[in-house]
Every structure is written in C-alpha cells, then in structure tokens.
Amino acid sequence: SAGLQMDVFELLTAVFATEDPDFSLAEDWEETRRILGRYPALDRINRTDFLTAVSLLVTSRAGHAAGQREDILNLTLADYLHARRELRTTFLETAEFLSQRCMLTIDQVPYTAQLIPLAVIFARLADTPRALASTKAWDKLNQWFWCGIFGELYGSAAVINRSARDVDQVTAWIEGRTEEVPKTIRDASFSESRFFSVRENSGVYQGIYALLMARGARDWRTSQPFDRWTFPELQPGFHRVFPQEWCRDNGIEDVVADSVLNRTPMGKRTEVVIDGYAPTRYLSRVQTKSLLEDSEFDTVLGTHELNTDLLYQSDFPNFLRDRRSRFLGMVEYAMGKPALRD
C-alpha cells in the first residue's frame, strides 16, 4: 500500500523472485547472519548493510563503487550470489582484523559503518595476488582505519558516498595503482581537546581504549595482555586511574576526571581493588595481589602509556600533562599525521 514503503531488502526480494521464484533472499540472509554471528563485533551488521557491501563490491569491479538504494536494486541474482559468497568470508576477515586490534565485542567497535567498506576492500584486494603481503600494504590499511576512527568520519548518517570512495581509493592505493592518498586520510583531523570532550558513546573513546590494549597494555593484577583469549576471564573495562571520589575530594573538575586521559584498560577484579583510593594507596594493594616483584610490576604499569613515578606520587596535574603528550603521540602515529594542538 502507499502508506507502507518497502525497504530495499523487500524490494530486492521481489526483484530476485522474478529471476528465480525458488530463491529466498530472507533465508539467504539468515544463513549470512548465522555465519557473521560467530563474531560479536559484527552484531550490528544488518541486512541492508550487507546488501550495501554487495553493491559496493559489484559496482567497484565494474568501474566505480556505489551503494545507494538504486544501485542495490540494479543487482542481478547472479551478481548477488557471487559477491555474497566472497563477503561472507571477508566480513570474517574484518572481524579478525578487529580482534587483532582488541575490538572483540560490539561495544568496542568505534564505527560499524566503517566495517562495510573494510570488508569490501578485503574482497577487492583478494583479486590481486599478494596485495597484502607487505608491511607497507598493512600500514596503509591501518592508517585508513585509524584515520576513519580518530577523524570521526564514519560517525555521520551520510557515509555511503564515503564508503564507495574509500573502496575505490584505498584499494588502488594499497595495490600501488596510485600514489594519491585516499580522501578519508586527507580529510581526517584530530584535535587535542577531544581528549576532554569524548565520552563512552564516542568512536574516539573506543578507539583509544582499543589502541592502548593493542599496543600492549597488560592487566595490573594478572599481568596478562588483553586479547581474545583473556577477555572472558579478565572482563576488562576502560576505568579511571584516579577514582571519581578521589577527584571530587581533591577539587578535580569532572570534565578532567572523566576524560580518556584518566582512563586505562583494567580487568574487573583489578578495578575492584582500587575502590576509590588514590594510586599512592591502591598500587601496593594491586601489587600484593599480582605477586610481582617491584620492577616487574612497574613494567606492567608502564605498558599503559603513563609515567609510573607520577602515578606512585598521585601527582594528578603532571600525570595528566604527561599522559596527554603520550596519547597525542599515540594518535598521531596511528593516523600518520599531526594532530591539532588546540
């Protein structure tokens, strides 16, 4: 009826039914959903996202990637089946890519929208033997990925055009067909002030949390790395180094106390030991639980991009200043370009 507009999935279902009455797009999607369901990080990939990926892949091979509604509706059943088979594989490769960067659950993925072009880029690069066989190629892919996150370029509603452009430009750049840096990398900029304004629902917040873990941060109590094998046991979160109560008692503004600069990955049982105390008090308690020697414990603390001496002294202003400088370097390295020091 005129009152109920069919979504693109329902329209394509009708299109495919004219080609093959026995084919059910809904049943086919359920099988795709089951395959992607092996990885919690892919939980927000919906059926329209998947059709967008199919369209981007098919059109990019034909000349230029496109993933708008009309592009999806131009797909033939043969186009769909061929691309769907590849994308079921490359979405799993995308989940592995995320896992290696310590993004294991849906809450840890900065932008689900960025996973659509990433899966398509993996499929396109598979057309070229050994396209990802060099460190340089992976460096390029990493740079694009982190620029998308810290530039917050996949956080808006209008990402289809960016996705299409990235599929074409990033693929060509990694394959060495062009020296031109993709527009997403050129567009990306990170302002230092974002350290104080991002909150839990932000891609930058999740990006910094993941980057700390991926760069080797270890749990203070167990000295274990945060990875797919230790996650179920550690149940980590991005917790405050200087607890909220301590910050309030010491006149620290909430905007500073709540910032990512005052957060670090901790296992659930580590965070419990902290219990509102200053580092000067809680560090000895954590170390006792860890059974580590002084030098070993200091090494573990140091994996968190922080100055251990300032932490032991509970010197919050200098701790924050030092960590801001370290975090800035970390973000600039990931993006491959300088940040705005505002």
Regions from the PLM with identified roles:
Residues 149-238, 246:
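Intrinsically disordered, low-complexity N-proximal targeting/linker segments that flank membranes
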Residues 121, 125-128, 144, 148-151, ...:
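Hydrophobic alpha-helical segments
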Residues 1:
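Duplex nucleic acid-engaging cores and interfaces of nucleic-acid transaction enzymes
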Residues 259-288:
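Short Cys/His-centered divalent metal-binding micro-motifs
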Residues 69, 129-130, 153-154, 247-250, ...:
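Short conserved micro-motifs at the rims of enzyme active sites and ligand-binding pockets
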Residues 4-193:
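A cross-family structural signal marking well-folded subdomains
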Residues 294-342:
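C-terminal, well-folded lobe of enzymatic/effector domains
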